[in-house]
Amino acid sequence: MKKILILLSIITVAAVSCGKIIQTEPEDAPQLEVNANNISGQWELVEWNGSYLSEGTYVYLDIVRNDKTYTMYQNMDSFTNVPHVLTGSYYLSTDVELGAIIRGNYDHDSGEWSHRYIIQSLTANEMLWVATDDFSFSQKFVRVDVIPVK
């Protein structure tokens, strides 16, 4: 038993020192109503189609409630650690069959998002998006206090 506790302590310290502890809520965490107020804030993409992002890859969203805009900081399409910053607007609607839908566009005539997403789950600290046109395409976000790449 002592060895197990020591091993768990070592793993925890290693994970914290690597900055990869991902806070997840219990499955019975209360669901929130999907609205601009409840999704506003800073979020980190932690899972893409059920898999964690590769080491060094990041996507952060800063969602603003008042004017329904967002800023995305990401390096998924970059060979450097310099964030690619994208801005735009988002829109929320409700589909009778699918539920809450989020869609958006990019500023500077860069077009619309590739998908519209069902916000399948929203708690105080987690949000799960599933593409309306491909239910196997999912993105899991966790709320963060600070976006470290701003």
Language-model features and meaning:
Residues 96-119:
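An anionic, turn-rich surface loop/hairpin at beta-sheet edges
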Residues 19-22:
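Bacterial signal peptide processing site
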Residues 94-96, 121-127:
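Ser/Thr- and Asn-enriched, surface-exposed coil loops between beta-strands
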Residues 53-101:
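N-terminal glycine/threonine-rich, aromatic-flanked beta-hairpin/loop signature
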Residues 2-8:
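Sec-dependent signal peptide recognition
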Residues 27-44:
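N-terminal helix-cap/turn-to-beta initiation motif at the start of protein domains
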Residues 84-95, 130-150:
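Edge beta-strand at a domain terminus
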Residues 14-17:
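C-terminal motif of bacterial Sec signal peptides marking the signal peptidase cleavage site
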